[in-house]
C-alpha cells in the first residue's frame, strides 16, 4: 500500500459552500462505491395561516428507504387541534409512496416525545445531558401501508397543510425559530456553532476530506467525517476526531456524538472510546444505523 501523502488540517466555523459540497460529495462517492448510492429527496409539509404565511410544519428528507424528520413545529395558537398528527400523517403517507419502510426523528422535549409515542413512534436511543439537564431522544416508527389520518374537524378552516420538496424553503426558518423559542425554557439558548476541519494535500486548495459538525446545547455533533482511501489507516481519522474533541472541550461541551452505518466505521469509533447508545435496523435495508457518543466531562457515558 502506498504511503499516505502529507496533509493539512484547517479549522473553520465559516466554511464555503464549495468546501461543504466537497466533504459531502466525498462521502457520497464512498457510500456509492460501497453499493449505497444516495437517493436523498427533501420532504416538507407547510402550515399556512389565514394570511397565507408559513407558520409552521414539517421539514425532512427521504433516503435509503427512510424518512428523516429534522423539524416539526406547530404555533401555540394552533396546537391541540390535531394539526401535528395530520402533518406527521401527510409526511408518512408521502414517505410510503416513495418506498420508505420507516421514519425517525429526534427531540429533547418530553411533551414532543409523548406526542410522537402517541403517533406510534418508539424510543430507539437516548443521550443524557443534551442539552444539559435534559435527555435527547431518538424515536423511530415502522411505516406499514396505513392510510393517512383524516383531517381533524377541530382544526376547521384555521389552517391549511401543503407539501413541498424544495431544497431551500421558508418553512425551515419558521420551524427553527419556533422550536428555538419552545426549547428556551428547558435548555436555554442552543449556542449553535458550525465547526469544520478540512483536509488538503500540500499545495492543493481543494479539500479531499475532513470533518464537518456543529455545537448545539453544549454537545458536539459530528455530521460528516470522510477521508480518501490513501489517507486512511495512518492515524489521520483519529487525529480529526481528537481535534473535534479538543474544540468541543474548549467550547465547554459536555460530550460528542455521531452516527454511522454498519458498513462504515463503527469499530473505528469504538476504538476511539465511543459507545453505541442507539441503533436503527434496516437503515438502509439489510444494514443498521448506529448512534455513538463519548462524554468529555468525566461523567460516565
Outline where the language-model segments fall:
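Conserved acetyl-CoA-binding loop-helix of GNAT-fold acetyltransferases
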Residues: 80-93, 118, 233-246, 271
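Conserved N-terminal entry element of GNAT/NAT acetyltransferase domains
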Residues: 1-15, 141-167, 298-301
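Conserved GNAT acetyl-CoA-binding A-motif
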Residues: 95-108, 248-261
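Conserved active-site tyrosine of GNAT-family acetyltransferases
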Residues: 23, 116, 121, 175, ...
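Helix-adjacent hinge/juxtasegments
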Residues: 69-86, 98, 222-239
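Acetyl-CoA-dependent GNAT
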Residues: 7-70, 75, 110, 129, ...
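Conserved catalytic-core motifs of GNAT/GCN5-like acyltransferases
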Residues: 104-106, 122-140, 257-259, 275-291
